[in-house]
């Protein structure tokens, strides 16, 4: 059996996936690169200060727009995950030792970058007794303490649905608690074998019950049907999800799940209208939308739709700005 780039042996599933060549993207999937002054300043700062964000390391297509708005995403808990999802670029393996200084370093990067809004996401750490709950919570707390004008969104694993571990994360009071369901029940176990669809919905419900703004994401093109997308949207809204993002699956490498279909822009328009009609407070949909795309602006819109005032320190998130270039209208 051949080896993966990280040196480990490829799984049988990965070998089977690799039999299908990487698909050619349709003409409507194009990045709109607008390198404004804020983006250029941040790019130079990140380079000279040797800072690290998911944005540049994952070559996110939305980096130009998000950085222009002083938003960025950070990965905590290491570069390897204890779980494997068939769409995810992060490799599976034994994670690095627990780094208790990481929250301070992330908060310092947020300060030096002058971010208006930071998204923090982490790998699953099933090897730890608390599955990384303290690390998630402490990173949010440290960013808030060191950067009072910065909003924080936590994009978390499910922590096995454990209420005590989730309560630790909730206690840090992020502006948004996000947990991505990603796909529909019929194909969920095949694509995300270490997660459970109903458990993920319950995690979102627990976030709602903690009086947090909640968020999730659906990736299309992994084998779902259009009807199943509608059913998943209804499930998420019933679970208490406030914000939903919907995107196209783009295959990270030949080892990953082949693309089942390319969703046309008009279908994203239809899905966005459907999600808004269901009652989601914030909806972004489009081939290149990602769950952290323009997250601060979407949070501000959702707070307004919920009838809540933004904290005075975060009022700037509602300032007029360019629209969501990568999302359908």
From Swiss-Prot:
Which cofactor is essential here?
A: [4Fe-4S] cluster
Write out the pathway annotation from the protein's UniProt entry: Protein modification; protein lipoylation via endogenous pathway; protein N(6)-(lipoyl)lysine from octanoyl-[acyl-carrier-protein]: step 2/2
Q: Which reaction does it catalyse?
A: [[Fe-S] cluster scaffold protein carrying a second [4Fe-4S](2+) cluster] + N(6)-octanoyl-L-lysyl-[protein] + 2 oxidized [2Fe-2S]-[ferredoxin] + 2 S-adenosyl-L-methionine + 4 H(+) = [[Fe-S] cluster scaffold protein] + N(6)-[(R)-dihydrolipoyl]-L-lysyl-[protein] + 4 Fe(3+) + 2 hydrogen sulfide + 2 5'-deoxyadenosine + 2 L-methionine + 2 reduced [2Fe-2S]-[ferredoxin]
Q: What is its main location?
A: cytoplasm
Q: Which InterPro entries match?
A: Aldolase_TIM, Elp3/MiaA/NifB-like_rSAM, LIAS_N, Lipoyl_synth, rSAM
EC number, as in UniProt:
2.8.1.8
Q: Where in the cell is it found?
A: Cytoplasm
* Residues binding [4Fe-4S] cluster 2: 81, 85, 88
GO MF annotations for this entry? 4 iron, 4 sulfur cluster binding; lipoate synthase activity; metal ion binding
Keywords, in A-Z order:
4Fe-4S, Cytoplasm, Iron, Iron-sulfur, Metal-binding, S-adenosyl-L-methionine, Transferase
User: If you read the UniProt record, what top EC class would you report for this enzyme, in one word?
Assistant: transferase
Key word Cytoplasm present in the record?
A: yes
Q: Which GO terms describe its cellular component?
A: cytoplasm
The Radical SAM core domain extends over: 67-281
Cite the binding residues for [4Fe-4S] cluster 1.
Answer: 55, 60, 66, 292
Cofactor mode of binding and number, as noted: Binds 2 [4Fe-4S] clusters per subunit. One cluster is coordinated with 3 cysteines and an exchangeable S-adenosyl-L-methionine.
For this chain, the family text in UniProt reads:
Belongs to the radical SAM superfamily. Lipoyl synthase family.
Q: Known PANTHER family for this protein?
A: LIPOYL SYNTHASE, LIPOYL SYNTHASE, MITOCHONDRIAL
Task: Write the protein's name.
Answer: Lipoyl synthase
> Which species does the entry assign this protein to?
Clavibacter sepedonicus
Tell me what gene encodes this: lipA
């Amino acid at each position: 059996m051949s080896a993966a780039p990280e040196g480990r042996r490829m799984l049988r599933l990965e070998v089977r996936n690799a039999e299908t060549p990487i698909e050619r993207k349709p003409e409507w999937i194009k990045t709109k690169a607008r390198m404004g002054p804020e983006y250029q300043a941040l790019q130079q700062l990140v380079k000279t200060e040797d800072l690290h964000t998911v944005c540049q390391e994952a070559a996110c297509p939305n980096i130009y727009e998000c950085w222009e708005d002083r938003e960025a995403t950070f990965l905590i808990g290491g570069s390897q995950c204890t779980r494997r999802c068939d769409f995810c670029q992060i490799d599976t393996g034994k994670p690095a030792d627990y780094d208790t200084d990481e929250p301070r370093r992330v908060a310092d990067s947020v300060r030096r970058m002058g971010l208006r809004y930071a998204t923090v996401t982490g790998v699953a750490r099933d090897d730890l007794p608390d599955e990384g709950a303290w690390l998630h919570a402490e990173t949010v707390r440290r960013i808030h303490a060191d950067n009072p004008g910065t909003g924080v969104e936590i994009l978390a694993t499910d922590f096995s649905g454990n209420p005590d571990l989730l309560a630790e994360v909730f206690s840090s009071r992020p502006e948004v608690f996000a947990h991505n369901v990603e796909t529909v029940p019929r194909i969920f176990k095949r694509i995300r074998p270490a997660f459970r669809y109903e458990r993920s919905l319950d995690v979102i419900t627990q976030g709602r019950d903690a009086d947090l703004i909640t968020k999730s994401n659906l990736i299309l093109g992994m084998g779902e049907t259009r009807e199943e997308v509608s059913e998943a949207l209804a499930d998420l809204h019933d679970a208490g999800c406030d914000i939903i993002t919907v995107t196209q699956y783009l295959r990270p490498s030949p080892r990953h799940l082949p693309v089942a279909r390319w969703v046309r822009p008009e279908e994203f328009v239809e899905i966005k209208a459907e999600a808004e009609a269901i009652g989601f407070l914030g909806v972004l949909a489009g081939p290149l939308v990602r769950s952290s795309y323009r997250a601060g602006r979407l949070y501000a819109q959702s707070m307004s739709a919920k009838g809540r005032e933004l904290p005075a320190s975060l009022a700037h998130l509602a300032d007029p700005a360019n629209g969501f270039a990568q999302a359908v209208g």
